[in-house]
């Protein structure tokens, strides 16, 4: 990133369900990162990324101007990645080739936190740790409800200290019910409709018990 004061807060608001194309200046002044399991995407057909090489997709439809239909490769920034840490165990730096098209995609849970491109280079793979998660939390800029989801995600991934920190910082008497609801909803496995304590593991139960013991 250059030494000026440009940040994600300078990006134009993305309209609902829509996308905004980034300028070269914006691309060059943001630090992009990506998290996934190993070098494979769990979305779609399980695309395996090449490291330090250009990855290019045929599934690219910016003409739709639709955040859900644009396709391409997704990635984020440090201020937003906390929301997506549940989706992987390995963090990568993202480099955009000079001829890549890059779009900021509307995301209510992480505004200016979902970017997509037709071409991407990933580099510098490193395992995500609790310490890294804590660092991302300290840098994070997210809507309140997203912190409750991120708290659940961190507990699922084993970043317990970060999850506890989020709980202590963000959960209070006025938002307790929504926080507990968001946490439980995030724990429910795919294919199930309602929460059960049977879905809790050792780490998620620690946060669950903090809710049960919270003095309202």
Q: What are these model-derived regions, one by one?
A:
Residues 108-176:
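Active-site-proximal loop/hinge segments that shape catalytic or ion-binding/gating pockets
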Residues 169-216:
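Charged, long alpha-helical assembly modules
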Residues 11, 32, 58-128:
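ADP-ribosyltransferase catalytic core
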Residues 35-42, 94-99, 155:
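Short, flexible beta-strand-to-coil junctions
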Residues 1-70, 212-214:
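ADP-ribose/NAD+-binding catalytic cleft of ART/PARP-like enzymes
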Residues 42, 48-50, 76, 117, ...:
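Intrinsically disordered, low-complexity, compositionally biased regions/tails
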């Amino acid at each position: 990133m250059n030494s000026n004061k440009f940040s994600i807060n300078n990006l134009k608001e993305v309209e609902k369900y829509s996308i905004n194309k980034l300028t070269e200046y914006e691309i060059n002044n943001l630090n992009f990162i990506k998290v996934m399991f190993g070098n494979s995407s769990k979305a779609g057909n399980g695309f395996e990324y090449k490291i330090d090489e250009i990855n290019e997709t045929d599934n690219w439809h910016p003409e739709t101007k639709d955040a859900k239909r644009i396709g391409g490769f997704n990635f984020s920034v440090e201020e937003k990645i906390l929301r997506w840490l549940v989706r992987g165990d390995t963090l990568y730096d993202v480099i955009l080739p000079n001829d890549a098209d890059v779009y900021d995609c509307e995301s209510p849970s992480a505004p200016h936190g979902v970017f997509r491109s037709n071409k991407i280079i990933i580099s510098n793979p490193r395992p995500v740790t609790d310490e890294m998660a804590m660092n991302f939390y300290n840098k994070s800029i997210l809507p309140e409800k997203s912190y409750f989801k991120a708290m659940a995600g961190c507990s699922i991934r084993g970043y317990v200290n970060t999850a506890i920190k989020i709980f202590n910082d963000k959960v209070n008497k006025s938002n307790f019910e929504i926080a507990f609801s968001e946490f439980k909803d995030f724990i429910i496995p795919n294919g199930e409709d309602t929460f059960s304590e049977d879905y809790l593991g050792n780490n998620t139960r620690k946060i669950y018990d903090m809710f049960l013991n919270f003095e309202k």
